[in-house]
């Protein structure tokens, strides 16, 4: 299992809340057969399970704080091990949020092949999130929480991008345009991996 994980393509997908990274991940799954693992989805399903861990996570998320690293890594690892035999690769969505998370991931799981940076401006992200909040029922899609989430995101993510840029594995896509125009940029980067 360990060896298989180390040989598998692992792509970190980083982008702010509302950047459209989730949508891009869905399209990558359809076209390339990767497995999409969103730390947010893993956490939310844990919360809705009503487990003790889920209740703790719920309190943390409602305050707009980040969930402990150990918890996230355990959940990611379990999900990857479950799929390693059938997947063409993994999209790790919303991770790492800080350099230490990336280093810990590499120690415990494997090295990323690429970091895909889905980059949209704060106004665009806010508008998309407010629109999503009308229909999603998510506790964290309101204006005040969005502002906090964006601040948290920028503060945490800039050092991560810088860290992986030194290794030459960051690929940035401009996420201001339509879903398809963003995806064509994504495909250019993924096709280069083959």
Swiss-Prot record:
Binding residues annotated for ATP, in chain numbering: 18-23, 132, 177
Keywords: Acetylation, ATP-binding, Cytoplasm, Disease variant, Hereditary hemolytic anemia, Kinase, Nucleotide-binding, Phosphoprotein, Transferase
InterPro entries, per the entry: Adenylat/UMP-CMP_kin, Adenylat_kinase_CS, AK1, AK1/5, P-loop_NTPase
A GO MF label: deoxyadenylate kinase activity
Protein name (Swiss-Prot/TrEMBL): Adenylate kinase isoenzyme 1
Lineage: Eukaryota, Metazoa, Chordata, Craniata, Vertebrata
Comment, domains: Consists of three domains, a large central CORE domain and two small peripheral domains, NMPbind and LID, which undergo movements during catalysis. The LID domain closes over the site of phosphoryl transfer upon ATP binding. Assembling and dissambling the active center during each catalytic cycle provides an effective means to prevent ATP hydrolysis.
Main enzyme class: transferase
Major localisation: cytoplasm
